[in-house]
Amino acid sequence: MLTCNKAGSGMVVDAASSNGPFQPVALLHIRDVPPADQEKLFIQKLRQCCVLFDFVSDPLSDLKWKEVKRAALSEMVEYITHNRNVITEPIYPEAVHMFAVNMFRTLPPSSNPTGAEFDPEEDEPTLEAAWPHLQLVYEFFLRFLESPDFQPNIAKKYIDQKFVLQLLELFDSEDPRERDFLKTTLHRIYGKFLGLRAYIRKQINNIFYRFIYETEHHNGIAELLEILGSIINGFALPLKEEHKIFLLKVLLPLHKVKSLSVYHPQLAYCVVQFLEKDSTLTEPVVMALLKYWPKTHSPKEVMFLNELEEILDVIEPSEFVKIMEPLFRQLAKCVSSPHFQVAERALYYWNNEYIMSLISDNAAKILPIMFPSLYRNSKTHWNKTIHGLIYNALKLFMEMNQKLFDDCTQQFKAEKLKEKLKMKEREEAWVKIENLAKANPQYAVYSQASAVSIPVAMETDGPQFEDVQMLKKTVSDEARQAQKELKKDRPLVRRKSELPQDPHTEKALEAHCRASELLSQDGR
């Protein structure tokens, strides 16, 4: 690349195929020249568009020539879209070169913080200043790839592994508009160049590995996963071993990263696509999710519950049997979560007909796992909505298998009695220890210096247990009431945030009046 020596110019010229620096000039329209000269003019315009301009340090420089380039790009987009047999062999190297000159650049360092301070949902992205030109270059290249005249056998000499690697590096751009074009461009290249497919997958793997184990920061993970979702959908059966390894060693560890919320929908789609292709992968996938289950991040836990329900929607009954016990042990913990959104999301599983059919077929294993958590939280959870959902789940279990429900109730009652007996024995043991201490001659001396508190009767965790019949009645009544509450037409009231307590802010709010009020006062 060469820099123009014109004073005050921000132009940079790529002159690989010319004799030296050149100034852009407004060329004729392609449609205004004879057909025999159109190819030559097309190539001239492609070379003209290799001139780069400064949009950052001096946005107002070279406005005339920036408009010349914009018009040329726009014209070429229209030309290859609406004309046939215009992409001849000499056009391929020029078109690829023009794209490379404009696009392949070192991305600026992120203006947002990295590491724990980075919040992908709050931090504003830095938009590309040269987008008026870059957008048209992307549009041209996409039309070029999608044209009926495009021949991959000719293009593969220019669109090679090096080109793909540089294209993938651009996915870390902060500008979402650019990443959207990149996603479509890479997908078209993957579809048309069979020889590059394995290489593209390998390089995407490398980006993911670096993201998971080194940087934990990359702007294009969601877009890359979206491309992979389409690729996975086209995998032939039976799945190759390399594809299974990709799922287990690359996709599943992506659940560990802090910024999961940015790309989770695309990741969940990829995982479900694999399970639809090969149901035998269900057990390792679910066990990996349980392994990576968040311990202290409730919003992330809700995401895991969403994904798990998507998996259960496509699970085979034979595979469900393998994972149901560890799965429902985790669900029991979620139902007990003090974070109401986690508990609520877990209890919504009981509104899913297919999941309920799986539970019904395996109630003998599942109900004993879930019953203690459901019963305890029906009395002790702080959120009333959760009470209604729990009673609904208990009612469904009760209707599913009355005898099993009674057995679980009695078993739970027996366990509570055991806990009370253990607690009583513990209290009695402490009383014996205190009495032995009192029998010691030195007791009086030390008791004055340090008063010994009388043991307090300790209560076991959870509420007092009800009679079985009373429990059934309570469950039915509460579930019915919860259904009524859900069906009520609630008025749409906007929740208002509390006003700040700062007196200066309050005075400013009181003194504030709308512009229309001021205008009406002036009108008087």
UniProtKB/Swiss-Prot annotation:
For region Disordered, the annotated ranges are 476-508
| InterPro entries from the UniProt entry | ARM-like, ARM-type_fold, PP2A_B56
Record carries keyword Signal: no
Q: Which residues carry this modification: N-acetylmethionine?
A: M1
Q: What is its main location?
A: nucleus
What keywords is this UniProt entry annotated with? Acetylation, Centromere, Chromosome, Nucleus
Tissue note: Highest levels in heart, liver and brain. Lower levels in skeletal muscle, spleen, kidney and lung. Isoform 4 is testis-specific.
Pfam families the UniProt entry points to: B56
Gene Ontology CC annotations of this record: chromosome, centromeric region; nucleus; protein phosphatase type 2A complex
What does the record give as the function of this protein? The B regulatory subunit might modulate substrate selectivity and catalytic activity, and might also direct the localization of the catalytic enzyme to a particular subcellular compartment. The PP2A-PPP2R5C holoenzyme may activate TP53 and play a role in DNA damage-induced inhibition of cell proliferation. PP2A-PPP2R5C may also regulate the ERK signaling pathway through ERK dephosphorylation.
- What family is this protein classified in? Belongs to the phosphatase 2A regulatory subunit B56 family.
Its quaternary structure?
PP2A consists of a common heterodimeric core enzyme, composed of PPP2CA a 36 kDa catalytic subunit (subunit C) and PPP2R1A a 65 kDa constant regulatory subunit (PR65 or subunit A), that associates with a variety of regulatory subunits. Proteins that associate with the core dimer include three families of regulatory subunits B (the R2/B/PR55/B55, R3/B''/PR72/PR130/PR59 and R5/B'/B56 families), the 48 kDa variable regulatory subunit, viral proteins, and cell signaling molecules. Interacts with SGO1. Interacts with SGO1; the interaction is direct. May interact with TP53.
* Identification of the protein by name: Serine/threonine-protein phosphatase 2A 56 kDa regulatory subunit gamma isoform
